[in-house]
């Protein structure tokens, strides 16, 4: 094929492949210690339990569970999901829609609401996958200022007045990539601003259950009085990313539009996978499984934080209460991209923070993942990074 004769859609003009996916090609090398991804630990994936539940589901439903299903979702799962979401969010949930991973929920929201040139306010830095999704819909991305606790409501209101956005995208709990958690008073204020200015809030909360210290906080959705907050949830981090089951919860009119959009995207989320997650919920298996995951991840996070405490002066880092990530800031004269090249030579990988930032910048920041490494790998890999940073400072 003559590549010069291929005319791709303009929506791809400003969208490149995920930098993380490119790094994944590198971390596949034998012996590589990777702090780069966001994968669950293999120990956390309940393969035997999923197998047992799938066998039970097939025995109970026969071939029907392998047939096409309703876009709105597998009926038993809709029932258990509605109760699960209401209990988790501590508020009335008027409508839910199962989706094929919570990233699809963001895609459907953009498909339903965003025209080319519409403005979406975003935390900066933010989750790269959904930033790419917004760019594919040719949205104008405007960053909102943050501090050590996350998004600043005063700057949010100023940006709303200035840019008249259609949507705000936020990850309020153990944010990806920073690990920060938004305080309850800011969550309340965001909901108030959404209702006052009629801005849809996409509250993306896939790490909510991965809490190792501290107490749970109310969702932004729980403060929503007029239906402007859409909650995006996921079972990828607490059961399995391979099942590709997530959900969105919120205003019925938005759910209906997203359902229409889903019909032309994948028809429906796999019935068998919905049924397996349904059984996780109905049989009360989630609390014990989540507790087991949190025990493992909490230990690994503490170990990585302990290693960071021995890093050279000039290195600062977040101290999350949960989630999968720690965000570190190196001295300003150190390029994380250059550091990555040297680290890969020593069989250690991470993601430079600039890849998560709207408009670039933050060249001296890195995101570190601890969930998918062994304790020995954390000690060895962090020791290598410490030595590389010390060498760069000298």
Where are these predicted regions, by residue range?
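N-terminal small-domain helix-loop-helix segment of the aminotransferase-like
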Residues: 11-101, 108, 282-283, 349, ...
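Conserved core of the PLP fold type I
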Residues: 59, 64-198, 208-226, 297, ...
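Hydrophobic residues in well-ordered beta-strands that form the structural core
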Residues: 122, 143, 201-203, 277, ...
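Conserved core segment of the aminotransferase class I/II
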Residues: 225-295
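Conserved glycine-rich beta-strand-loop-beta hairpin in the small C-terminal domain of fold type I
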Residues: 278, 295-305, 316-329, 339
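Short, conserved charged micro-motifs
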Residues: 334-339, 376-380
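PLP-dependent enzyme catalytic core of the Aspartate aminotransferase-like
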Residues: 345-346, 359-394
């Amino acid at each position: 094929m003559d590549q010069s004769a291929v005319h791709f859609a303009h929506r791809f003009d400003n969208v490149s492949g995920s930098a993380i996916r490119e790094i994944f090609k590198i971390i596949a090398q034998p012996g590589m210690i990777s702090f780069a991804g966001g994968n669950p630990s293999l120990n956390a994936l309940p393969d035997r339990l999923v197998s047992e539940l799938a066998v039970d589901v097939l025995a109970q439903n026969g071939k029907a569970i392998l047939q096409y299903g309703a876009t709105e979702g597998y009926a038993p799962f809709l029932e258990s999901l509605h109760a699960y979401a209401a209990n988790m969010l501590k508020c009335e949930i008027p409508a839910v829609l199962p989706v094929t991973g919570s990233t699809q929920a963001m895609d459907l929201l953009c498909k339903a609401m965003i025209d080319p040139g519409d403005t979406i306010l975003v935390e900066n830095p933010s989750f790269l996958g959904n930033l790419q999704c917004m760019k594919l819909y040719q949205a104008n991305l405007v960053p909102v200022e943050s501090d050590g606790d996350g998004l600043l409501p005063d700057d949010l209101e100023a940006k709303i007045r200035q840019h008249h956005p259609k949507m705000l995208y936020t990850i309020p709990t153990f944010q990806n990539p920073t690990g920060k958690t938004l305080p309850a008073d800011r969550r309340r204020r965001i909901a108030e601003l959404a209702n006052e200015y009629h801005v849809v809030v996409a509250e993306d909360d896939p790490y909510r259950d991965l809490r190792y210290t501290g107490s749970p906080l109310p969702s932004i959705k729980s403060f929503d009085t007029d239906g402007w907050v859409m909650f995006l949830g996921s079972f990828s981090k607490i059961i399995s990313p391979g099942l590709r089951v997530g959900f969105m919860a919120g205003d019925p009119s938005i759910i209906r539009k997203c359902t229409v959009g889903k019909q032309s995207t994948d028809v429906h989320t796999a019935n068998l996978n919905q049924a397996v997650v349904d059984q996780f919920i109905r049989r009360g298996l989630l609390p014990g499984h989540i507790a087991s995951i949190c025990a493992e991840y909490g230990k690994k996070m503490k170990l990585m934080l302990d290693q960071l405490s021995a890093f050279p002066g000039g290195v600062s880092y977040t101290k999350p209460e949960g989630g999968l990530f720690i965000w570190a800031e190196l001295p300003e004269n150190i390029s994380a991209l250059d550091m990555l090249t040297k680290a890969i030579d020593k069989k250690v990988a991470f993601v430079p923070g600039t890849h998560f930032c709207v408009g670039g910048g933050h060249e001296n920041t890195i995101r570190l993942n601890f969930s998918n490494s062994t304790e020995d790998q954390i000690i060895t890999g962090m020791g290598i990074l410490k030595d590389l940073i010390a060498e760069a400072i000298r």
